[in-house]
Each structure stands twice: as structure tokens, then as C-alpha cells.
């Protein structure tokens, strides 16, 4: 038993230059663990609540000094002396201490920083890397990266309504090769955009953010880049979308403002299904809005046996909401974002529930990231087989990919790459 003897916290900056929380947990053995908390731009209405100061004189009101003080004060007092190896008890105590149903009292950012830092400390005490410490099956799976190479929506200041256009190197023989495939397509895409006189600046997640005549035009340009890089669309590399449709859904209507088009739920599902017929799209995230469960039913009936349908804003990594979705037979996959739910234990529970129901899980970053690499270890430890952590630029994104390269090297033939079998309905 390694007892917690100290917990430190500080206000740091994320990849958008906004404050976030970092925590360190120190054990009586001398082992230490540290974790930094990300932050989203397009957030689900039912996500756990991050605590911001609201003081307009500091960071435009986005400071997190209150959350930091909650770590240094009540959280430290409550956890000191507890066994860091008992993650479930640590997280249960944090939830009880907060007392709300959305972690809004202490702040999900304060709670998550300590929850993850505790796991890192316990892993260090066990003299294991985090992925090995968290793994329970003895099997390890390197994830297929879902690389967001064109950014739109809330992640970029451009004309594209939909948030992410991704490539999935499902045909690669290893994670290392998958990363190479993606990087080569990324650079080919930059050349395609430049040759057309389009902007090659990047958005929050490192993907390009050009102004295009339509959302569909982004797909065409990516397919051109895949072929230019020497790969076969649909074989070596497939496509994924994060529609983030809650961002443009109101009063029962989906509005693609850049195209001047409006759709009912059924019409928008038809629109996405037509793209699946036409292009090698194998995964669609948040194709329907989080509150349009009727639309999700239509969407799942239409595409749920053909491709992967991922719920992000729909499920917000919440085990209880996921169970409701499974009972309603909507979607067939869940996006896993640790800060949506706020503790490691609940995150792992969501992955377990999804797997038991035959749903896939995609471990994900947030648009406001840090150099922390915890999600890379979680993806490998839980064998989800998929990770979404941005494009092939910006060190806040590349840090996760580089961590996965190191994990792959450490595991050698003890691990395999997820490939086509990791994506729902693709194997």
C-alpha cells in the first residue's frame, strides 16, 4: 500500500493559450504522478462541468485558480492517507466530496487532474508504464489513428460547417507505418491546397482550415491527396467524419450555413448516407444532434449495419447515458473523452459497458490540449483499437503519436495494430 502524502496543483496553459489545471500526486514511497486536463470547444450539454473563475481581469474570465485551490484544499485533505492503488476508492471519494451530479462544485478539471495523476503515481510506484499498469487482459492493441486533416466548424475560422474530416490508415501493417501514411497524406494535402491557392494555415487540432465551396469539397480534396501520396482510398486509407451536428441543429432543423441548405433529421440522414454510398467513409461521429434521439434512430437504422456511428456529444463518456443509448439501439460506438466524465474509473466503466454491448470505443483528445499523453496509454491499456488525437502538426497532437511509437517499440510482438478489425463494421 502506497499512501498519498501530498497533492500539488497549478494553473497552466493549454494549446489555445487558455488556463487549465495540472496536478501532482506524491506517495509515501517517493513515487510521483502528474496530469494535465484538456478542454473542449464544441461541448456536449451533459458534460461534467469545468470550473472557471469568471474574473474578467484575468484570462478573459477563463482562469482556473478556484479549481487549483480546490485541489490544494478540500481534495488534498480528503485523499491524504488513501491508497493510490485503489483507483475506484479515490474516484468515489472525489465524487462524494463534490456532491453534485456534474462535478460542478469542485470542478471536473480539478477532479480529473487528481484522478489521472493518482493513476500515474500508482503506476510509477508499481514500476510500470501507465498502459501496463491499467491493462487487465494481458493483451495490447495499438490504435488506428483517426487523423483530422481538415478542420471546420468550431475548430476553425473558415467556411466549413462540419468539424472534422479524418483519414484512417486501416491498411497499414503497424502503428508506425500508419503514422507514416498519415504524415505523407498530410503533406500531399498541403501541396494540393497550395497549388489551388487555398490557405494552408491550421486549426485547433492541427488540420488545414481552408475556405471551400462546400463540405463535400473537403472529401474530394482529401481523396486527391491520398492518391497523390501513393495510397488507395478505401484500401490503405479510409475516411471518417465528425459532423458535430449539434452545433448547427435548432428547432428540428440541420442548417449547413455555408451552403445555404436546411434539412430535417430524415433528410440529413439521407444526405450522409449518400456520402457513404459515394465515398470510402467508414466512421461518422455525431451525425445527429445530441438531443435528436429520434434522428439518431433513423440514422442508426440507415447506416448502423454498414459503418461505425460514434456518439460524442450524444453520450459524453457517461456510463448512464451510454446505457440509455444502448437500450434505445442508437449509434454503435462511443467517443471516450476523459474530461467529459471527470474520473478515470468512470472512463474505464464506459469503455467496459460499450464493449459488453458490442459497441466500439474511440479514445479522444480535446481541441484545447496539452503536451500530456495519458490518453495514448489509456487507448493501449484498454485495447479500444482507435484513437482520435488530431492531425500531423502541432506538438500537442504529435506528443500522443510519439508516445504511441514508444509504446509500440516497448511492447514489440506483445502488441498488434488494430487495422481494419478495430473499426465497427469494417472487418
UniProtKB/Swiss-Prot annotation:
Transmembrane segments: none annotated. GO terms for cellular component: cell surface; extracellular region; phosphopyruvate hydratase complex. SMART domains: Enolase_C, Enolase_N. Mg(2+) binds at residues 242, 285, 312. Disulfide bonds: none annotated. Keywords: Cytoplasm, Glycolysis, Lyase, Magnesium, Metal-binding, Secreted. The active site is at residues 205, 337. Belongs to the enolase family. This is Enolase 2.
Amino acid at each position: 500500500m502506497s499512501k498519498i502524502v501530498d497533492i500539488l496543483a497549478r494553473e497552466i496553459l493549454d494549446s489555445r493559450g487558455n488556463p487549465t489545471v495540472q496536478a501532482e500526486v506524491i506517495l509515501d514511497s517517493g513515487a510521483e504522478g502528474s496530469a494535465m486536463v484538456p478542454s473542449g470547444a464544441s461541448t456536449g450539454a451533459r458534460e461534467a462541468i469545468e470550473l472557471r473563475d469568471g474574473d474578467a481581469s484575468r484570462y478573459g474570465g477563463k482562469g482556473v485558480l478556484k479549481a487549483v485551490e480546490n485541489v490544494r484544499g478540500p481534495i488534498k485533505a480528503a485523499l491524504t492517507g488513501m491508497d493510490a492503488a485503489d483507483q475506484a476508492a479515490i474516484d468515489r471519494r472525489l465524487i462524494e466530496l463534490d456532491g453534485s451530479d456534474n462535478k460542478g462544485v469542485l470542478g471536473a478539471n480539478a477532479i480529473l487532474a487528481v484522478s489521472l495523476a493518482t493513476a500515474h503515481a500508482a503506476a510509477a510506484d508499481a514500476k510500470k508504464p501507465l498502459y501496463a499498469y491499467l491493462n487487465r487482459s494481458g493483451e495490447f492493441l495499438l490504435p488506428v489513428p483517426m487523423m483530422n486533416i481538415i478542420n471546420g466548424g468550431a475548430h476553425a475560422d473558415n467556411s466549413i460547417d462540419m468539424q472534422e474530416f479524418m483519414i484512417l490508415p486501416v491498411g497499414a501493417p503497424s502503428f508506425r507505418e500508419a503514422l507514416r501514411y498519415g504524415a505523407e497524406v498530410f503533406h500531399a494535402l498541403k501541396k494540393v491546397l497550395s497549388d489551388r491557392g487555398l490557405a494552408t494555415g491550421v486549426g485547433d487540432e492541427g488540420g488545414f482550415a481552408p475556405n471551400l465551396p462546400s463540405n463535400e469539397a473537403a472529401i474530394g480534396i482529401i481523396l486527391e491527396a491520398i492518391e497523390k501520396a501513393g495510397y488507395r482510398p478505401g484500401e490503405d486509407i479510409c475516411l471518417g467524419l465528425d459532423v458535430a451536428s449539434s452545433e448547427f441543429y435548432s428547432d428540428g432543423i440541420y442548417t449547413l450555413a455555408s451552403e445555404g441548405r436546411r434539412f430535417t433529421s430524415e433528410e440529413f440522414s439521407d444526405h450522409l448516407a449518400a456520402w457513404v454510398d459515394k465515398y470510402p467513409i467508414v466512421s461518422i461521429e455525431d451525425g445527429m444532434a445530441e438531443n435528436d434521439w429520434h434522428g439518431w434512430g433513423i440514422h442508426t437504422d440507415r447506416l448502423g449495419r454498414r459503418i461505425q456511428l460514434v456518439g460524442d456529444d450524444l453520450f459524453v463518456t457517461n456510463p448512464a447515458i451510454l446505457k440509455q443509448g444502448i437500450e434505445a439501439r442508437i449509434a454503435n460506438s462511443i467517443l471516450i473523452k476523459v474530461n467529459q466524465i471527470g474520473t478515470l474509473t468512470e472512463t474505464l466503466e464506459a469503455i467496459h459497458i460499450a464493449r459488453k454491448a458490442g459497441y466500439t470505443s474511440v479514445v479522444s483528445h480535446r481541441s484545447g490540449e496539452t503536451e500530456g499523453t495519458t490518453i495514448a496509454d489509456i487507448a493501449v491499456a484498454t485495447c479500444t483499437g482507435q484513437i482520435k488525437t488530431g492531425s500531423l502538426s502541432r506538438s500537442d497532437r504529435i506528443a500522443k503519436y510519439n508516445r504511441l511509437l514508444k509504446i509500440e517499440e516497448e511492447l514489440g510482438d506483445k502488441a498488434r495494430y488494430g487495422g481494419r478489425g478495430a473499426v465497427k463494421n469494417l472487418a
